[in-house]
């Protein structure tokens, strides 16, 4: 059996042994320690085991951010099963696809979403067990009843979790219009330092001129370390390239030990948090890669994760939580989250002095938003993460002392390249457009789709890369300029939407002959789904009826914001859509209706 020190379950339990009474999850008045989360996930695992779950079975989770979400994933992992995400905004047809595509044997679902499950449940042949967070119906098990089982480690009749297992499936939008499962393995821990270490290295030179608020005491108590960091001696030392290199090397080594080292290293790191607690507020949904991979990091480190209580994003609740819990880092998704937060900061009076890190993943902060955040929170370090279910990267950090705030910037590195059509590296200053390639922190492939796996995960000169279609150029200074997804993927508020799925739903309306949707620039959402529709000859299209049909068949974020009627949708002779002309038509129609 492969050594299992990388697998989440044993890593988590090593942290539990080290800091059983340390807070693990906080959501309003609900607080669970590492020991309590461990016991609750053990009980859930034993309930699944008693109801016929088997090694390698898939366990789907359809829930908002909560401790129950984390516990459900841990329970599945302890059984050497494969947890997977279900977007809680999905409609019945989308839920049916994921349950059947994954072959899920069990589903943990919040009672709010039972109406989505009800009409398609009979079509989910492999689904044997449904556990309901809230009130359960006949034949199902309530989550609280499931927790009444034994809290001891599950007595497995099969091989325990190991590094050969699939750790979890992350379902994401696919180019065919249906979500596809991306397989992540425990080796994710081997490569987390590739995401974090370059960011730390690029931060070190900036510390010599960092704002003094960055090193201000958070608890009102000064320490020798903080006094040193505030001193002129530290600023002089950290300005020296040799010191930056040696310190960067040491930090990278510590990160490798933290994530991929023996279990005792995880326990050692966790014990250190008693002196420096790090509360991370995960404001983006756990059902997406950004949220869940952040949670994985927290669990491996022995930190505490905090969730908001409301069913809808509430900026005032977030700032109250930051103040009440002395939050040190926040994970959100771009301007769609940040702009309402800024508006609330303008209206209210909140203590944000505890904040150190503001991270956006999936959608970058605009420079204007970064500038505004730093004006309100001068001690914060701002980060943009290149986020996709198939690979991750992190931008250079931005501090208030940087002056003019730049747009998101990534740099060529060992784990991040740009390749042209001949698999040659695009060099700095070359005007060529290539495809961004990410190595290291990448998944194993797509669930049940070997062809797409071969196309997306390619080995070039002995190194495996994820190439998901983001086109890019390399600037003179080695920074990477992202140009957009070659496949036409629309990124709206951090949700990735592929045009083909929306178009196929629109075409179900009898009066619609042809259609196309694109993403147009939107101040809040990054991109807004907008489209054109052409009627059958002699027919008239009722736009409100089309939008209502989309609302019935698609998650709300996939519904077009605007649709316009045109005589004909531009296509090439081979039938392919002419997207440049489609965008022109959309803009023309928007200007007419303005």
Segments predicted by a language model, with ranges:
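Structural core segment of the AMP-binding/adenylate-forming
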Residues: 50-51, 78-149, 159-160, 537-539
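Conserved pre-ATP/AMP-binding loop-to-beta segment of ANL
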Residues: 152-171, 178, 201, 265-280
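Conserved AMP-binding/adenylate-forming
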Residues: 30, 45-90, 303, 308, 323, 333-336, 496, ...
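Conserved AMP-binding/adenylation subdomain of ANL enzymes
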Residues: 190-279, 288-329
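Adenylate-forming
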Residues: 109-118, 220-221, 235-236, 241-250, ...
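Flexible, low-complexity linker/hinge segments
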Residues: 1-6, 141-166
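AMP-binding/adenylate-forming catalytic core of the ANL superfamily
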Residues: 68, 90, 96, 107-109, ...
């Amino acid at each position: 059996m492969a050594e299992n020190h990388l697998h989440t379950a044993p890593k988590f339990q090593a942290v539990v042994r080290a800091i059983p009474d340390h807070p693990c999850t906080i959501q309003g008045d609900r607080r669970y320690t590492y020991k309590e989360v461990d016991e609750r996930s053990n009980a859930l695992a034993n309930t699944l085991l008693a109801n016929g779950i088997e090694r390698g079975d898939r366990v789907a989770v359809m829930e908002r951010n909560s401790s129950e979400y984390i516990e459900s994933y841990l329970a599945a992992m302890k059984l050497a099963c494969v947890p997977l995400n279900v977007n809680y905004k999905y409609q019945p047809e989308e839920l049916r696809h994921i349950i059947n595509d994954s072959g899920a044997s069990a589903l943990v679902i919040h009672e709010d979403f039972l109406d989505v499950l009800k009409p398609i449940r009979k079509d989910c042949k492999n689904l044997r067990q449904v556990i309901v967070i809230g009130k359960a119906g006949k034949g199902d098990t309530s989550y609280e009843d499931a927790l009444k089982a034994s809290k001891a480690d599950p007595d497995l009749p099969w091989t325990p979790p190991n590094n050969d297992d699939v750790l979890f499936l992350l379902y994401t939008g696919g180019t065919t219009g249906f979500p596809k499962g991306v397989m992540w393995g425990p080796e994710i821990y081997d490569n987390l330092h590739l995401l974090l270490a370059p960011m730390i290295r690029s931060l070190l030179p900036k510390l010599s001129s960092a704002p003094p608020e960055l090193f201000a005491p958070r608890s009102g108590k000064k320490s020798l370390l903080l006094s040193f960091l505030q001193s002129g001696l530290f600023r002089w030392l950290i300005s020296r390239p040799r010191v930056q290199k040696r310190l960067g090397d040491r930090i990278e080594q510590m990160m490798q030990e933290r994530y991929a080292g023996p279990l005792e290293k995880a326990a050692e790191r966790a014990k250190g948090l008693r002196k420096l607690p790090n509360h991370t507020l995960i404001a983006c949904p756990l059902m997406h890669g950004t949220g869940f991979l952040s949670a994985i990091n927290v669990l491996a480190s022995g930190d505490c994760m905090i969730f908001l209580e409301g069913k809808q994003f509430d900026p005032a609740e977030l700032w109250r939580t930051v103040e009440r819990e002395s939050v040190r880092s926040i994970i959100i998704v771009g301007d769609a989250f940040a702009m309402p937060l800024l508006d609330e900061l303008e209206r209210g009076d909140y203590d944000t002095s505890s904040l150190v890190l503001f991270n956006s993943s999936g959608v970058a902060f605009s420079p204007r938003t970064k500038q505004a955040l730093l004006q309100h929170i001068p001690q914060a370090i701002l980060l943009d993460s290149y986020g996709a279910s198939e690979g991750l990267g992190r931008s250079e950090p931005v501090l208030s002392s940087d002056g003019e705030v730049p747009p998101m910037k990534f740099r060529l590195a060992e784990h991040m390249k740009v390749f042209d059509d001949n698999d040659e590296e695009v060099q700095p200053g070359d005007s060529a457009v290539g495809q961004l390639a990410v190595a290291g922190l990448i998944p194993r492939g797509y669930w049940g789709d070997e062809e797409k796996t071969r196309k997306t995960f390619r080995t070039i000169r002995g190194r495996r890369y994820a190439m998901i279609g983001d086109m890019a150029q390399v600037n003179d200074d080695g920074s990477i300029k992202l140009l957009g997804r070659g496949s036409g993927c629309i990124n709206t508020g951090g949700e990735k939407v592929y045009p083909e799925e929306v178009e196929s739903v629109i075409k179900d309306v009898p009066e619609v002959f042809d259609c196309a949707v694109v993403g147009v620039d939107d101040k809040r959402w990054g991109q807004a789904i907008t489209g054109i529709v052409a009627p059958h000859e002699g027919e008239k299209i009722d736009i409100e009826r089309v939008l209502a049909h989309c609302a019935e068949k698609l998650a709300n974020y996939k519904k077009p914001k605007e649709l316009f009627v045109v005589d004909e949708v531009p296509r090439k002779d081979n039938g392919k859509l002419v997207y440049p002309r489609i965008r022109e038509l959309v803009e023309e129609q928007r200007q007419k209706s303005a």
